[in-house]
Design a protein with these regions (language model features):
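C-terminal motif of bacterial Sec signal peptides marking the signal peptidase cleavage site
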Residues: 12-15
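Extended ligand-binding regions for polar small-molecule ligands
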Residues: 17, 56-65, 143-145, 216-254
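Extracytoplasmic small-molecule ligand-binding "clamshell" domains
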Residues: 25-95
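Periplasmic-binding protein-like
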Residues: 37, 114-121, 187, 191, ...
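Bilobed "Venus flytrap"/periplasmic-binding protein-like clamshell domains
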Residues: 38, 51-61, 118-170, 182, ...
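Short helix-initiation/N-cap motifs at beta->coil->alpha
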Residues: 56, 72-83, 162-177, 213
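Acidic, polar ligand-binding/catalytic clefts
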Residues: 64, 69-133, 203, 208-209
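A ligand-binding cleft/hinge motif common to bilobed small-molecule-binding domains
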Residues: 96-104, 150-153, 176, 181-211
Length: 262
């Protein structure tokens, strides 16, 4: 969430009859979507270097429903918002949590995914509340993620117990190598990793201290037209049932749990 790669999802674009409105995309417009493809299952790189995942499939479905074109651009997490603000990308879709602070510098679509923060630990390690994090020598977070904000609020921003990393894969690797006592990150990403790596000896724990969060698609301040286009397309995808099909491809249905999600 580091080399830059492009992945295009050029979807069919047909001219709409009638007069244009704020939700219509120009005929030759290709929306550049900034994404840090180190956040499976939302975005990752396949063997050919193409961005894939839940966010990509959802955006592709939205583009088809809304008659616009998109192109995914993989880049480091810390460069996503600067790239949006300086015009290098038109949209950021990369598991971005909607926060009041971020709303000061960018616009957000309607929420498209609900998550919370969880604690990833070696199997058998007990964590009853966020207070237990204070007694750990090293708690890992990804810089700029909401896990970073949550742990910083709990322990203090400059607390040496907080170990910051550039991506989820790096931080999980450090935990597996014994360099961390725990990792705090987004629930869907951590649950997906534990489910797909049962031999790693990891488990995750949900805590009531961490509130529910929502992912949104970001656009530049003042670009209400793009936000309207995205919201209209997202609504169509939800109403058609396509959202549910994409969700089921990556995540367990409500009520289902993996062995780790006890």
């Amino acid at each position: 969430w580091l080399a830059t790669a492009l992945a295009c999802s050029a979807l069919a674009l047909t001219a709409c009859g009638g007069q244009s409105n704020n939700a219509s995309a120009p005929a030759d417009k290709v929306y550049r979507v900034g994404s840090n493809a180190e956040f499976a299952p939302f975005e990752s790189l396949d063997s050919a270097g193409k961005v894939e995942g839940f966010d990509v499939d959802l955006m592709d479905a939205m583009a088809k429903a809304g008659n616009f074109k998109v192109e995914f651009k993989h880049q480091p997490w810390e460069s996503l918002f600067p790239s949006l603000n300086n015009g290098d990308v038109d949209i950021v879709m990369s598991g971005v949590t909607i926060t009041d602070d971020r709303k000061q510098s960018m616009l957000f679509s309607d929420p498209y995914f609900e998550i919370t923060q969880v604690v990833l630990v070696p199997k058998g390690k007990k964590v009853a509340s966020s207070e237990d994090l204070k007694n750990m020598a090293k708690v890992g977070v990804v810089t700029g993620y909401t896990g970073d904000f949550s742990v910083s609020k709990l322990l203090g921003n400059d607390n040496p117990k907080i170990a910051r990393f550039e991506s989820v894969p790096l931080i999980i690797k450090e935990l597996e190598n014994g360099g961390l006592d725990s990792v705090v990150s987004d629930s869907a990403v951590i649950a997906n990793y534990v489910k797909n790596n049962p031999t790693k000896g990891l488990d995750f724990i949900s805590l009531p201290d961490f509130t529910i969060e929502n992912y949104g698609i970001a656009a530049r301040k003042g670009d209400e037209a793009t936000i309207k286009m995205l919201n209209d397309a997202l609504k169509k995808v939800r109403e058609s049932g396509e959202y549910d099909k994409i969700y089921a491809k990556y995540f367990a249905k409500e009520g289902e749990k993996t062995e780790a999600a006890k």
